Amino acid sequence: MSKIIGIDLGTTNSAVAVLEGTESKIIANPEGNRTTPSVVSFKNGEIIVGDAAKRQAVTNPDTVISIKSKMGTSEKVSANGKEYTPQEISAMILQYLKGYAEDYLGEKVTKAVITVPAYFNDAQRQATKDAGKIAGLEVERIVNEPTAAALAYGLDKTDKEEKILVFDLGGGTFDVSILELGDGVFDVLSTAGDNKLGGDDFDQKIIDHLVAEFKKENGIDLSTDKMAMQRLKDAAEKAKKDLSGVTSTQISLPFITAGEAGPLHLEMTLTRAKFDDLTRDLVERTKVPVRQALSDAGLSLSEIDEVILVGGSTRIPAVVEAVKAETGKEPNKSVNPDEVVAMGAAIQGGVITGDVKDVVLLDVTPLSLGIETMGGVFTKLIDRNTTIPTSKSQVFSTAADNQPAVDIHVLQGERPMAADNKTLGRFQLTDIPAAPRGIPQIEVTFDIDKNGIVSVKAKDLGTQKEQTIVIQSNSGLTDEEIDRMMKDAEANAEADKKRKEEVDLRNEVDQAIFATEKTIKETEGKGFDAERDAAQAALDDLKKAQEDNNLDDMKTKLEALNEKAQGLAVKLYEQAAAAQQAQEGAEGAQATGNAGDDVVDGEFTEK
Protein backbone atom coordinates (compact mmCIF):
# COMPACT_ATOMS: atom_id res chain seq x y z
CA MET A 1 0.00 0.00 0.00
CA SER A 2 1.36 3.44 -0.90
CA LYS A 3 2.41 5.84 1.82
CA ILE A 4 -0.17 8.09 3.49
CA ILE A 5 1.45 11.42 4.35
CA GLY A 6 0.49 13.42 7.43
CA ILE A 7 -0.14 17.14 6.94
CA ASP A 8 -0.47 19.90 9.52
CA LEU A 9 -2.19 22.63 7.49
CA GLY A 10 -1.51 25.61 9.76
CA THR A 11 -2.53 29.26 9.79
CA THR A 12 1.05 30.55 9.83
CA ASN A 13 3.13 27.47 8.99
CA SER A 14 2.45 24.00 7.64
CA ALA A 15 4.39 20.75 7.85
CA VAL A 16 4.35 17.31 6.25
CA ALA A 17 5.53 14.02 7.73
CA VAL A 18 5.68 10.36 6.77
CA LEU A 19 6.01 7.13 8.71
CA GLU A 20 9.35 5.39 8.15
CA GLY A 21 9.34 2.01 9.83
CA THR A 22 7.81 2.75 13.21
CA GLU A 23 9.01 6.36 13.38
CA SER A 24 7.31 9.50 12.13
CA LYS A 25 9.68 11.74 10.17
CA ILE A 26 9.22 15.40 9.19
CA ILE A 27 10.06 16.03 5.52
CA ALA A 28 12.12 19.18 4.94
CA ASN A 29 11.03 21.54 2.16
CA PRO A 30 13.26 22.41 -0.85
CA GLU A 31 14.87 25.22 1.19
CA GLY A 32 15.81 22.74 3.93
CA ASN A 33 13.25 24.01 6.47
CA ARG A 34 11.10 21.59 8.45
CA THR A 35 8.06 23.88 8.38
CA THR A 36 6.73 25.87 5.43
CA PRO A 37 5.04 29.29 5.69
CA SER A 38 1.34 29.02 4.76
CA VAL A 39 1.77 31.87 2.27
CA VAL A 40 0.79 31.97 -1.41
CA SER A 41 1.76 34.72 -3.85
CA PHE A 42 1.21 35.27 -7.55
CA LYS A 43 3.80 36.83 -9.84
CA ASN A 44 3.85 36.99 -13.64
CA GLY A 45 1.32 34.16 -13.81
CA GLU A 46 3.38 31.96 -11.50
CA ILE A 47 2.09 30.56 -8.19
CA ILE A 48 4.71 30.83 -5.44
CA VAL A 49 4.25 29.01 -2.11
CA GLY A 50 6.13 28.96 1.18
CA ASP A 51 9.39 30.71 2.07
CA ALA A 52 9.76 32.42 -1.32
CA ALA A 53 6.20 33.76 -1.13
CA LYS A 54 6.74 35.05 2.40
CA ARG A 55 9.95 36.85 1.41
CA GLN A 56 8.17 38.89 -1.25
CA ALA A 57 5.06 39.65 0.83
CA VAL A 58 6.24 43.22 1.51
CA THR A 59 6.58 44.16 -2.15
CA ASN A 60 3.98 41.90 -3.77
CA PRO A 61 0.34 42.90 -3.12
CA ASP A 62 -0.82 39.61 -4.68
CA THR A 63 0.19 37.68 -1.56
CA VAL A 64 -2.25 35.70 0.61
CA ILE A 65 -1.54 34.89 4.28
CA SER A 66 -3.48 33.18 7.10
CA ILE A 67 -6.07 31.72 4.69
CA LYS A 68 -6.98 29.08 7.28
CA SER A 69 -8.91 31.73 9.23
CA LYS A 70 -11.32 32.01 6.26
CA MET A 71 -11.93 28.27 5.81
CA GLY A 72 -15.61 27.38 6.05
CA THR A 73 -16.74 30.89 5.09
CA SER A 74 -18.03 32.21 1.77
CA GLU A 75 -15.38 34.95 1.83
CA LYS A 76 -13.05 35.03 -1.18
CA VAL A 77 -9.64 36.63 -1.66
CA SER A 78 -8.62 38.72 -4.66
CA ALA A 79 -5.18 38.18 -6.16
CA ASN A 80 -3.64 37.94 -9.59
CA GLY A 81 -6.73 39.63 -11.06
CA LYS A 82 -8.95 36.74 -9.95
CA GLU A 83 -11.06 35.71 -6.97
CA TYR A 84 -10.11 32.56 -5.09
CA THR A 85 -11.99 30.55 -2.45
CA PRO A 86 -10.12 29.67 0.76
CA GLN A 87 -10.22 26.04 -0.40
CA GLU A 88 -8.32 26.90 -3.60
CA ILE A 89 -5.57 28.82 -1.77
CA SER A 90 -5.27 26.04 0.83
CA ALA A 91 -5.05 23.52 -2.03
CA MET A 92 -2.04 25.41 -3.43
CA ILE A 93 -0.27 25.00 -0.07
CA LEU A 94 -1.24 21.31 0.09
CA GLN A 95 -0.04 20.78 -3.48
CA TYR A 96 3.35 22.28 -2.60
CA LEU A 97 3.68 20.03 0.48
CA LYS A 98 2.58 17.01 -1.57
CA GLY A 99 5.14 17.89 -4.27
CA TYR A 100 8.19 17.95 -2.04
CA ALA A 101 6.97 14.87 -0.14
CA GLU A 102 6.90 13.05 -3.50
CA ASP A 103 10.44 14.27 -4.27
CA TYR A 104 11.61 12.89 -0.90
CA LEU A 105 9.81 9.55 -1.21
CA GLY A 106 10.57 9.09 -4.90
CA GLU A 107 7.00 8.02 -5.59
CA LYS A 108 3.60 9.55 -6.27
CA VAL A 109 1.52 10.51 -3.22
CA THR A 110 -2.27 10.32 -3.48
CA LYS A 111 -3.42 9.91 0.12
CA ALA A 112 -3.12 12.08 3.22
CA VAL A 113 -4.28 12.57 6.77
CA ILE A 114 -4.87 16.29 7.34
CA THR A 115 -5.25 17.91 10.74
CA VAL A 116 -7.68 20.65 11.78
CA PRO A 117 -8.21 22.56 15.03
CA ALA A 118 -10.37 20.50 17.40
CA TYR A 119 -12.85 23.36 17.53
CA PHE A 120 -13.35 23.52 13.75
CA ASN A 121 -17.04 23.21 12.87
CA ASP A 122 -18.51 21.02 10.14
CA ALA A 123 -18.20 23.67 7.40
CA GLN A 124 -14.50 24.21 8.19
CA ARG A 125 -13.81 20.45 8.17
CA GLN A 126 -15.63 19.99 4.87
CA ALA A 127 -13.68 22.92 3.37
CA THR A 128 -10.40 21.28 4.46
CA LYS A 129 -11.43 18.00 2.84
CA ASP A 130 -12.36 19.86 -0.37
CA ALA A 131 -8.96 21.61 -0.38
CA GLY A 132 -7.27 18.20 -0.21
CA LYS A 133 -9.35 16.94 -3.11
CA ILE A 134 -8.50 19.99 -5.25
CA ALA A 135 -4.81 19.36 -4.51
CA GLY A 136 -5.15 15.81 -5.85
CA LEU A 137 -5.21 14.15 -2.44
CA GLU A 138 -7.62 11.57 -1.14
CA VAL A 139 -8.13 12.70 2.45
CA GLU A 140 -8.19 9.43 4.38
CA ARG A 141 -8.91 11.11 7.67
CA ILE A 142 -9.42 14.54 9.20
CA VAL A 143 -7.81 14.48 12.66
CA ASN A 144 -8.02 17.08 15.41
CA GLU A 145 -4.65 18.76 15.98
CA PRO A 146 -4.41 18.12 19.75
CA THR A 147 -5.31 14.46 19.15
CA ALA A 148 -2.58 14.13 16.52
CA ALA A 149 -0.10 15.70 18.96
CA ALA A 150 -1.14 13.20 21.63
CA LEU A 151 -0.57 10.33 19.18
CA ALA A 152 2.99 11.50 18.50
CA TYR A 153 3.64 12.03 22.22
CA GLY A 154 2.14 8.76 23.40
CA LEU A 155 3.01 6.22 20.69
CA ASP A 156 5.96 4.85 22.69
CA LYS A 157 4.02 4.98 25.97
CA THR A 158 1.17 2.59 25.09
CA ASP A 159 1.88 0.35 28.09
CA LYS A 160 1.38 3.24 30.50
CA GLU A 161 -1.96 4.71 31.60
CA GLU A 162 -2.11 8.47 31.93
CA LYS A 163 -4.38 11.44 31.41
CA ILE A 164 -2.90 14.31 29.41
CA LEU A 165 -3.97 17.87 28.68
CA VAL A 166 -2.93 19.15 25.25
CA PHE A 167 -2.67 22.95 25.09
CA ASP A 168 -2.54 23.90 21.40
CA LEU A 169 -2.03 27.60 20.59
CA GLY A 170 -1.23 28.02 16.90
CA GLY A 171 -1.10 30.93 14.51
CA GLY A 172 -4.84 31.49 14.33
CA THR A 173 -6.64 28.97 16.54
CA PHE A 174 -6.57 27.69 20.10
CA ASP A 175 -7.64 24.24 21.36
CA VAL A 176 -7.48 22.34 24.61
CA SER A 177 -8.07 18.58 24.60
CA ILE A 178 -7.96 16.09 27.43
CA LEU A 179 -7.12 12.50 26.56
CA GLU A 180 -6.79 9.23 28.39
CA LEU A 181 -3.94 7.03 27.15
CA GLY A 182 -3.61 3.34 27.94
CA ASP A 183 -3.16 -0.05 26.20
CA GLY A 184 -2.77 1.66 22.83
CA VAL A 185 -6.12 3.46 23.13
CA PHE A 186 -6.10 7.26 22.71
CA ASP A 187 -9.47 8.28 24.11
CA VAL A 188 -10.41 11.97 23.83
CA LEU A 189 -12.45 12.84 26.93
CA SER A 190 -13.19 16.46 26.05
CA THR A 191 -12.19 19.36 23.86
CA ALA A 192 -12.70 23.12 24.06
CA GLY A 193 -11.24 26.10 22.29
CA ASP A 194 -11.40 29.42 20.50
CA ASN A 195 -11.13 29.58 16.70
CA LYS A 196 -10.40 33.32 16.83
CA LEU A 197 -7.30 33.24 19.03
CA GLY A 198 -3.71 32.61 17.96
CA GLY A 199 -0.24 33.97 17.29
CA ASP A 200 -1.61 36.40 14.67
CA ASP A 201 -3.50 38.17 17.47
CA PHE A 202 -0.28 38.58 19.48
CA ASP A 203 1.38 40.05 16.37
CA GLN A 204 -1.55 42.43 15.90
CA LYS A 205 -1.14 43.80 19.45
CA ILE A 206 2.47 44.74 18.63
CA ILE A 207 1.41 46.25 15.27
CA ASP A 208 -1.30 48.37 16.94
CA HIS A 209 1.24 49.57 19.52
CA LEU A 210 3.79 50.52 16.84
CA VAL A 211 1.16 52.34 14.76
CA ALA A 212 -0.07 54.28 17.81
CA GLU A 213 3.44 55.26 18.93
CA PHE A 214 4.49 56.32 15.43
CA LYS A 215 1.34 58.42 15.03
CA LYS A 216 1.98 60.06 18.40
CA GLU A 217 5.54 61.00 17.38
CA ASN A 218 5.03 61.88 13.70
CA GLY A 219 1.32 62.53 13.23
CA ILE A 220 1.13 59.94 10.43
CA ASP A 221 -1.21 56.92 10.51
CA LEU A 222 0.68 53.93 9.09
CA SER A 223 -2.45 51.73 9.14
CA THR A 224 -3.55 53.26 5.82
CA ASP A 225 -0.29 52.29 4.09
CA LYS A 226 -0.50 48.68 2.88
CA MET A 227 3.23 48.22 2.30
CA ALA A 228 4.14 49.78 5.65
CA MET A 229 1.64 47.47 7.38
CA GLN A 230 3.21 44.39 5.80
CA ARG A 231 6.65 45.53 7.01
CA LEU A 232 5.16 46.12 10.46
CA LYS A 233 3.65 42.61 10.45
CA ASP A 234 7.01 41.03 9.61
CA ALA A 235 8.73 43.13 12.31
CA ALA A 236 6.03 42.30 14.89
CA GLU A 237 6.34 38.56 14.24
CA LYS A 238 10.13 38.76 14.57
CA ALA A 239 9.89 40.84 17.78
CA LYS A 240 7.45 38.33 19.28
CA LYS A 241 9.86 35.47 18.55
CA ASP A 242 12.86 37.46 19.86
CA LEU A 243 11.07 38.17 23.14
CA SER A 244 10.71 34.44 23.78
CA GLY A 245 14.48 34.36 24.27
CA VAL A 246 15.47 37.88 25.38
CA THR A 247 13.85 40.51 27.59
CA SER A 248 14.18 43.37 25.10
CA THR A 249 14.34 43.75 21.31
CA GLN A 250 14.98 46.61 18.90
CA ILE A 251 12.50 47.23 16.08
CA SER A 252 14.13 49.16 13.25
CA LEU A 253 12.27 49.99 10.03
CA PRO A 254 14.11 52.64 7.98
CA PHE A 255 12.17 54.64 5.38
CA ILE A 256 8.82 53.34 6.67
CA THR A 257 7.09 56.37 5.15
CA ALA A 258 7.70 59.99 4.17
CA GLY A 259 6.65 63.22 5.85
CA GLU A 260 6.81 66.83 4.70
CA ALA A 261 10.48 67.06 5.71
CA GLY A 262 11.46 63.84 3.94
CA PRO A 263 11.73 60.13 4.77
CA LEU A 264 10.77 58.88 8.24
CA HIS A 265 12.16 55.88 10.09
CA LEU A 266 10.60 53.73 12.81
CA GLU A 267 12.99 52.97 15.68
CA MET A 268 11.57 51.48 18.84
CA THR A 269 12.59 49.24 21.72
CA LEU A 270 10.02 46.68 22.87
CA THR A 271 10.53 45.00 26.22
CA ARG A 272 9.06 41.66 27.22
CA ALA A 273 7.26 43.40 30.09
CA LYS A 274 5.54 45.77 27.62
CA PHE A 275 4.68 42.86 25.30
CA ASP A 276 3.17 40.96 28.24
CA ASP A 277 1.14 44.04 29.14
CA LEU A 278 -0.12 44.45 25.54
CA THR A 279 -1.17 40.81 25.28
CA ARG A 280 -2.46 40.23 28.81
CA ASP A 281 -6.10 39.91 27.66
CA LEU A 282 -5.14 37.29 25.04
CA VAL A 283 -3.32 35.18 27.62
CA GLU A 284 -6.35 35.46 29.94
CA ARG A 285 -8.58 34.13 27.14
CA THR A 286 -6.60 30.86 27.07
CA LYS A 287 -7.68 30.03 30.62
CA VAL A 288 -11.42 29.66 29.95
CA PRO A 289 -11.16 26.69 27.53
CA VAL A 290 -8.76 24.92 29.93
CA ARG A 291 -11.37 25.10 32.68
CA GLN A 292 -14.15 24.14 30.25
CA ALA A 293 -12.28 21.04 29.03
CA LEU A 294 -11.55 19.89 32.60
CA SER A 295 -15.19 20.41 33.58
CA ASP A 296 -16.50 18.51 30.52
CA ALA A 297 -14.10 15.63 31.20
CA GLY A 298 -15.21 15.52 34.84
CA LEU A 299 -11.61 15.75 36.02
CA SER A 300 -9.76 17.80 38.59
CA LEU A 301 -6.28 19.26 37.98
CA SER A 302 -4.72 16.67 40.28
CA GLU A 303 -5.88 13.90 37.92
CA ILE A 304 -3.91 15.31 34.95
CA ASP A 305 -0.54 13.53 34.60
CA GLU A 306 1.06 15.59 31.83
CA VAL A 307 0.53 18.92 30.06
CA ILE A 308 1.71 18.97 26.43
CA LEU A 309 2.36 22.28 24.64
CA VAL A 310 1.61 22.41 20.91
CA GLY A 311 1.90 25.27 18.39
CA GLY A 312 4.60 27.91 17.97
CA SER A 313 2.75 30.44 20.14
CA THR A 314 3.30 28.24 23.22
CA ARG A 315 6.90 29.49 23.19
CA ILE A 316 5.69 32.88 24.47
CA PRO A 317 6.91 33.03 28.11
CA ALA A 318 3.67 34.59 29.42
CA VAL A 319 1.68 31.74 27.86
CA VAL A 320 3.93 29.12 29.47
CA GLU A 321 3.57 30.86 32.85
CA ALA A 322 -0.22 30.99 32.43
CA VAL A 323 -0.33 27.25 31.69
CA LYS A 324 1.78 26.55 34.80
CA ALA A 325 -0.46 28.77 36.94
CA GLU A 326 -3.69 27.29 35.56
CA THR A 327 -2.70 23.61 35.70
CA GLY A 328 -0.21 23.64 38.56
CA LYS A 329 2.16 21.61 36.40
CA GLU A 330 5.43 22.16 34.57
CA PRO A 331 4.64 21.57 30.87
CA ASN A 332 6.19 18.51 29.24
CA LYS A 333 8.71 19.69 26.63
CA SER A 334 9.54 16.33 25.07
CA VAL A 335 7.83 17.18 21.77
CA ASN A 336 8.58 19.90 19.21
CA PRO A 337 5.50 22.17 19.24
CA ASP A 338 5.92 23.06 15.53
CA GLU A 339 6.28 19.49 14.27
CA VAL A 340 4.36 17.18 16.59
CA VAL A 341 0.95 17.61 14.87
CA ALA A 342 2.21 16.58 11.41
CA MET A 343 4.08 13.67 13.01
CA GLY A 344 0.87 12.52 14.71
CA ALA A 345 -1.01 12.78 11.40
CA ALA A 346 1.60 10.52 9.77
CA ILE A 347 1.16 8.02 12.61
CA GLN A 348 -2.60 8.02 11.98
CA GLY A 349 -1.73 7.34 8.32
CA GLY A 350 0.29 4.35 9.55
CA VAL A 351 -2.69 3.13 11.59
CA ILE A 352 -4.84 3.23 8.42
CA THR A 353 -2.27 1.33 6.30
CA GLY A 354 -1.70 -1.20 9.09
CA ASP A 355 1.95 -0.21 9.62
CA VAL A 356 1.11 0.91 13.17
CA LYS A 357 -0.65 -1.82 15.09
CA ASP A 358 -2.57 -1.94 18.39
CA VAL A 359 -3.40 1.77 18.35
CA VAL A 360 -7.01 2.94 18.56
CA LEU A 361 -7.97 6.60 18.27
CA LEU A 362 -11.29 7.67 19.79
CA ASP A 363 -12.01 11.31 18.95
CA VAL A 364 -14.98 13.51 19.82
CA THR A 365 -17.25 16.08 18.20
CA PRO A 366 -16.33 19.54 19.56
CA LEU A 367 -19.80 21.14 19.37
CA SER A 368 -23.36 19.99 19.97
CA LEU A 369 -25.57 19.22 16.97
CA GLY A 370 -29.33 19.55 16.63
CA ILE A 371 -32.25 21.17 14.83
CA GLU A 372 -34.48 24.19 15.23
CA THR A 373 -37.86 23.37 16.79
CA MET A 374 -41.00 25.41 17.46
CA GLY A 375 -40.35 28.87 18.91
CA GLY A 376 -36.83 29.08 17.48
CA VAL A 377 -35.43 26.72 20.11
CA PHE A 378 -32.22 24.73 19.48
CA THR A 379 -32.96 21.08 20.29
CA LYS A 380 -29.74 19.06 20.67
CA LEU A 381 -29.52 15.53 19.32
CA ILE A 382 -25.79 14.97 19.85
CA ASP A 383 -23.99 16.66 22.75
CA ARG A 384 -20.47 18.05 22.42
CA ASN A 385 -17.61 15.70 23.34
CA THR A 386 -19.53 12.64 22.09
CA THR A 387 -17.12 10.01 20.74
CA ILE A 388 -17.20 9.73 16.95
CA PRO A 389 -18.26 8.12 14.68
CA THR A 390 -21.76 8.24 16.14
CA SER A 391 -25.43 8.25 15.19
CA LYS A 392 -28.46 9.56 17.09
CA SER A 393 -32.19 9.63 16.23
CA GLN A 394 -35.16 11.47 17.71
CA VAL A 395 -38.83 11.61 16.68
CA PHE A 396 -40.51 14.99 16.10
CA SER A 397 -43.92 15.97 14.78
CA THR A 398 -45.69 18.75 12.89
CA ALA A 399 -46.48 22.14 14.44
CA ALA A 400 -49.70 22.80 12.48
CA ASP A 401 -52.75 20.85 11.28
CA ASN A 402 -52.47 19.29 7.82
CA GLN A 403 -48.87 20.44 7.49
CA PRO A 404 -47.63 19.05 4.11
CA ALA A 405 -43.90 19.52 4.68
CA VAL A 406 -41.34 20.13 7.41
CA ASP A 407 -38.22 22.29 7.14
CA ILE A 408 -35.21 20.76 8.86
CA HIS A 409 -32.81 23.51 10.01
CA VAL A 410 -29.54 21.83 11.09
CA LEU A 411 -27.41 23.69 13.65
CA GLN A 412 -24.15 23.36 15.57
CA GLY A 413 -23.36 25.16 18.81
CA GLU A 414 -24.15 25.47 22.51
CA ARG A 415 -26.64 28.37 22.75
CA PRO A 416 -30.30 27.59 23.67
CA MET A 417 -31.81 29.60 20.80
CA ALA A 418 -31.37 28.49 17.18
CA ALA A 419 -30.53 31.99 15.90
CA ASP A 420 -27.43 32.14 18.13
CA ASN A 421 -25.86 28.97 16.72
CA LYS A 422 -24.07 28.09 13.46
CA THR A 423 -26.35 27.02 10.60
CA LEU A 424 -24.93 23.94 8.90
CA GLY A 425 -27.70 23.53 6.36
CA ARG A 426 -31.42 23.29 5.63
CA PHE A 427 -33.54 20.75 3.79
CA GLN A 428 -37.21 19.81 3.44
CA LEU A 429 -39.24 16.63 3.90
CA THR A 430 -42.36 16.93 1.72
CA ASP A 431 -45.57 14.99 0.93
CA ILE A 432 -46.55 14.45 4.56
CA PRO A 433 -50.17 13.10 4.57
CA ALA A 434 -52.77 15.54 5.97
CA ALA A 435 -53.19 15.00 9.70
CA PRO A 436 -53.78 16.99 12.89
CA ARG A 437 -50.68 18.59 14.43
CA GLY A 438 -48.66 16.24 16.59
CA ILE A 439 -49.81 13.10 14.76
CA PRO A 440 -47.19 12.62 11.98
CA GLN A 441 -44.03 10.94 13.24
CA ILE A 442 -40.89 12.50 11.74
CA GLU A 443 -37.68 10.72 12.73
CA VAL A 444 -34.54 12.87 12.44
CA THR A 445 -31.20 11.01 12.45
CA PHE A 446 -27.77 12.63 12.77
CA ASP A 447 -24.66 10.74 11.64
CA ILE A 448 -21.13 11.99 12.31
CA ASP A 449 -18.33 10.12 10.53
CA LYS A 450 -14.76 9.58 11.74
CA ASN A 451 -13.76 12.94 10.18
CA GLY A 452 -16.40 14.82 12.20
CA ILE A 453 -18.45 15.50 9.04
CA VAL A 454 -22.22 15.45 9.49
CA SER A 455 -25.07 13.94 7.48
CA VAL A 456 -28.73 14.24 8.47
CA LYS A 457 -31.75 12.12 7.51
CA ALA A 458 -35.45 12.91 8.04
CA LYS A 459 -37.98 10.07 7.67
CA ASP A 460 -41.79 10.06 7.82
CA LEU A 461 -42.45 6.88 9.83
CA GLY A 462 -45.99 6.74 8.44
CA THR A 463 -45.10 6.70 4.73
CA GLN A 464 -41.45 5.59 5.09
CA LYS A 465 -40.49 8.52 2.81
CA GLU A 466 -37.10 9.96 3.68
CA GLN A 467 -34.75 12.77 2.73
CA THR A 468 -31.00 12.77 3.40
CA ILE A 469 -28.31 15.44 3.07
CA VAL A 470 -24.60 15.52 3.72
CA ILE A 471 -24.25 18.94 5.26
CA GLN A 472 -22.97 21.53 2.84
CA SER A 473 -22.71 25.03 4.24
CA ASN A 474 -23.10 28.29 2.35
CA SER A 475 -19.36 28.21 1.75
CA GLY A 476 -19.41 24.62 0.51
CA LEU A 477 -18.34 23.72 -3.00
CA THR A 478 -20.35 21.58 -5.40
CA ASP A 479 -18.74 18.49 -6.95
CA GLU A 480 -18.61 20.36 -10.28
CA GLU A 481 -16.75 23.29 -8.68
CA ILE A 482 -14.29 20.92 -6.99
CA ASP A 483 -13.68 19.09 -10.29
CA ARG A 484 -13.04 22.40 -12.07
CA MET A 485 -10.64 23.52 -9.34
CA MET A 486 -8.85 20.15 -9.47
CA LYS A 487 -8.34 20.57 -13.23
CA ASP A 488 -7.08 24.14 -12.67
CA ALA A 489 -4.69 22.92 -9.97
CA GLU A 490 -3.39 20.12 -12.22
CA ALA A 491 -2.94 22.56 -15.10
CA ASN A 492 -1.09 24.98 -12.81
CA ALA A 493 1.11 22.16 -11.52
CA GLU A 494 1.98 21.17 -15.10
CA ALA A 495 2.63 24.81 -16.05
CA ASP A 496 4.76 25.32 -12.92
CA LYS A 497 6.74 22.18 -13.74
CA LYS A 498 7.38 23.38 -17.30
CA ARG A 499 8.34 26.83 -16.04
CA LYS A 500 10.81 25.30 -13.57
CA GLU A 501 12.29 23.07 -16.28
CA GLU A 502 12.69 26.14 -18.50
CA VAL A 503 14.44 28.10 -15.73
CA ASP A 504 16.71 25.11 -14.96
CA LEU A 505 17.60 24.79 -18.66
CA ARG A 506 18.41 28.50 -18.99
CA ASN A 507 20.61 28.30 -15.87
CA GLU A 508 22.43 25.25 -17.27
CA VAL A 509 22.99 27.04 -20.59
CA ASP A 510 24.41 30.14 -18.85
CA GLN A 511 26.66 27.95 -16.70
CA ALA A 512 27.88 25.91 -19.70
CA ILE A 513 28.65 29.04 -21.76
CA PHE A 514 30.61 30.58 -18.86
CA ALA A 515 32.58 27.38 -18.14
CA THR A 516 33.39 26.70 -21.82
CA GLU A 517 34.56 30.26 -22.51
CA LYS A 518 36.85 29.95 -19.47
CA THR A 519 38.27 26.62 -20.67
CA ILE A 520 38.83 27.90 -24.23
CA LYS A 521 40.74 30.89 -22.81
CA GLU A 522 42.86 28.67 -20.54
CA THR A 523 43.83 26.36 -23.44
CA GLU A 524 44.93 29.13 -25.80
CA GLY A 525 48.37 28.37 -27.28
CA LYS A 526 48.53 24.91 -25.67
CA GLY A 527 48.25 22.91 -28.89
CA PHE A 528 44.63 21.72 -28.73
CA ASP A 529 43.49 23.59 -31.81
CA ALA A 530 41.15 20.87 -33.13
CA GLU A 531 39.39 20.40 -29.79
CA ARG A 532 39.26 24.16 -29.16
CA ASP A 533 37.74 24.83 -32.59
CA ALA A 534 35.11 22.10 -32.05
CA ALA A 535 34.19 23.52 -28.62
CA GLN A 536 34.06 27.07 -30.02
CA ALA A 537 31.73 25.99 -32.85
CA ALA A 538 29.42 24.21 -30.38
CA LEU A 539 29.54 27.27 -28.13
CA ASP A 540 28.52 29.58 -31.00
CA ASP A 541 25.64 27.23 -31.89
CA LEU A 542 24.36 27.29 -28.30
CA LYS A 543 24.60 31.08 -28.10
CA LYS A 544 22.59 31.33 -31.32
CA ALA A 545 19.88 29.02 -29.91
CA GLN A 546 19.86 31.14 -26.74
CA GLU A 547 19.40 34.34 -28.78
CA ASP A 548 16.57 32.72 -30.78
CA ASN A 549 14.95 31.64 -27.48
CA ASN A 550 14.40 28.17 -28.95
CA LEU A 551 14.18 25.84 -25.93
CA ASP A 552 14.31 22.54 -27.86
CA ASP A 553 17.30 23.77 -29.86
CA MET A 554 18.97 25.00 -26.65
CA LYS A 555 18.60 21.54 -25.11
CA THR A 556 20.15 19.82 -28.18
CA LYS A 557 22.97 22.35 -28.54
CA LEU A 558 23.71 22.19 -24.79
CA GLU A 559 24.26 18.43 -25.02
CA ALA A 560 26.54 18.93 -28.04
CA LEU A 561 28.55 21.63 -26.25
CA ASN A 562 28.93 19.52 -23.10
CA GLU A 563 30.37 16.71 -25.23
CA LYS A 564 32.90 18.98 -27.03
CA ALA A 565 33.81 20.89 -23.86
CA GLN A 566 34.42 17.61 -22.05
CA GLY A 567 36.84 16.53 -24.79
CA LEU A 568 38.74 19.79 -24.39
CA ALA A 569 38.76 19.48 -20.60
CA VAL A 570 40.15 15.92 -20.84
CA LYS A 571 43.03 17.16 -23.04
CA LEU A 572 43.75 19.97 -20.58
CA TYR A 573 43.72 17.51 -17.67
CA GLU A 574 46.03 15.07 -19.48
CA GLN A 575 48.50 17.87 -20.24
CA ALA A 576 48.43 19.05 -16.61
CA ALA A 577 48.96 15.47 -15.37
CA ALA A 578 51.90 14.96 -17.76
CA ALA A 579 53.48 18.24 -16.62
CA GLN A 580 53.05 17.19 -12.99
CA GLN A 581 54.74 13.83 -13.63
CA ALA A 582 57.61 15.50 -15.49
CA GLN A 583 58.11 17.94 -12.61
CA GLU A 584 58.10 15.13 -10.04
CA GLY A 585 60.65 13.20 -12.18
CA ALA A 586 62.95 16.22 -12.38
CA GLU A 587 62.71 16.83 -8.64
CA GLY A 588 63.55 13.15 -7.99
CA ALA A 589 66.65 13.30 -10.20
CA GLN A 590 67.80 16.50 -8.51
CA ALA A 591 67.38 14.95 -5.08
CA THR A 592 69.55 11.96 -6.13
CA GLY A 593 72.28 14.28 -7.47
CA ASN A 594 72.29 16.33 -4.28
CA ALA A 595 72.62 13.19 -2.20
CA GLY A 596 75.95 12.43 -4.03
CA ASP A 597 77.25 15.94 -3.37
CA ASP A 598 76.78 15.48 0.35
CA VAL A 599 79.36 12.62 0.54
CA VAL A 600 82.78 13.83 1.96
CA ASP A 601 86.04 12.03 2.71
CA GLY A 602 86.98 11.73 6.33
CA GLU A 603 90.43 11.17 7.92
CA PHE A 604 90.79 9.03 11.04
CA THR A 605 93.90 8.88 13.29
CA GLU A 606 94.59 5.88 15.51
CA LYS A 607 95.71 6.59 19.06
Curated annotation (Swiss-Prot):
Keyword Chaperone: yes
Sequence ranges of Acidic residues compositional bias: 598-607
Gene3D superfamilies, alphabetized: 1.20.1270.10, 3.30.420.40, Actin, Chain A, domain 4 (3.90.640.10), Substrate Binding Domain Of DNAk, Chain A, domain 1 (2.60.34.10)
Modified residues (Phosphothreonine): 173
InterPro entries cross-referenced by the UniProt entry: ATPase_NBD, Chaperone_DnaK, Heat_shock_70_CS, HSP70_C_sf, HSP70_peptide-bd_sf, Hsp_70_fam
Biased composition (Low complexity): 581-591
Keywords from the UniProt entry: ATP-binding, Chaperone, Nucleotide-binding, Phosphoprotein, Stress response
GO MF term list: ATP binding; ATP-dependent protein folding chaperone; unfolded protein binding
Range of residues in the leader sequence: none
Highest rank taxon of the organism: Bacteria
Disordered: annotated span: 581-607
Pfam families noted in UniProt: HSP70 (PF00012)
Keyword Lyase: no
Expression induction or repression: By stress conditions e.g. heat shock.
Family: Belongs to the heat shock protein 70 family.
Cited HAMAP family: DnaK (MF_00332)
Purpose: Acts as a chaperone.
PANTHER family assigned: HEAT SHOCK PROTEIN 70KDA
The protein's name: Chaperone protein DnaK
Native source species: Streptococcus pneumoniae serotype 4 (strain ATCC BAA-334 / TIGR4)
Gene transcribed to yield this protein: dnaK
